[in-house]
């Protein structure tokens, strides 16, 4: 019976040894890969973590400093990274719809109203639409073709020839001209 027990213990020792070898191999692989990444500087997350740590130390130092009173300096807003920003962006942009100069902080709400989009939009005439209508009116005072039936040139086609292809009817249908009609 001692042979069977020796056999079981040798199997247990063998399986334990194989397991320990596998664990050692995995640890060596992970350690060598981490060393390679750190040595070559390939770990970008490490730079991000170091930058966040530096910024948090600076922010704690600013908060702990009694001479740095954030309430007295209301001209600029300090974000969580310690950077100062003006309360409303002061850069000026030209509206591509109406041509007005708009401060950057009000540009998006202005564009919603100006272009007639968004929840607060309303249909209104802007300078650009008025200018476009004036340009179109000056371009051709007497158009050759008009889709409206009461115009002076209602029987002319886009080419300028008289209405040969079709005849305009009062009920908005087109009747073809056929010989013998």
Curated annotation (Swiss-Prot):
GO cellular-component term (any): nucleoplasm
PTM entry text: Ubiquitinated in DET1-dependent manner. Ubiquitination probably leads to its subsequent proteasomal degradation.
Mutant lacking the gene: phenotype: Delayed flowering and increased levels of histone H2B monoubiquitination.
GO terms for MF: zinc ion binding
Residue ranges of the region described as Disordered: 116-181
Chain ranges of zinc fingers (SGF11-type): 93-114
Cysteines engaged in disulfide bonds, as pairs: none
Principal place of residence: nucleus
Swiss-Prot/TrEMBL GO biological process terms: chromatin organization
InterPro entries reported in the protein's UniProt record: SAGA_su_Sgf11 (IPR013246)
Gene3D superfamilies: Classic Zinc Finger (3.30.160.60)
Alphabetic keyword roster: Activator, Chromatin regulator, Metal-binding, Nucleus, Transcription, Transcription regulation, Ubl conjugation, Ubl conjugation pathway, Zinc, Zinc-finger
Subcellular location, record wording: Nucleus, Nucleoplasm
Stretches with biased composition (Basic residues): 116-125
Positions with biased composition (Low complexity): 126-153
Subunit-structure text: Component of a deubiquitination module (DUB module) formed by ENY2, SGF11, and UBP22 in Arabidopsis. Interacts directly with ENY2 and UBP22. Interacts with DDA1.
Family as reported in the entry's similarity comment: Belongs to the SGF11 family.
Function recorded in the entry: Component of a deubiquitination module (DUB module) that specifically deubiquinates monoubiquinated histone H2B (H2Bub). Does not seem to be a component of the TREX-2 complex. Seems to act independently of the SAGA multiprotein complex. The DUB module is responsible for the major H2Bub deubiquitinase activity in Arabidopsis.
Full protein name: SAGA-associated factor 11
GN (gene name): SGF11
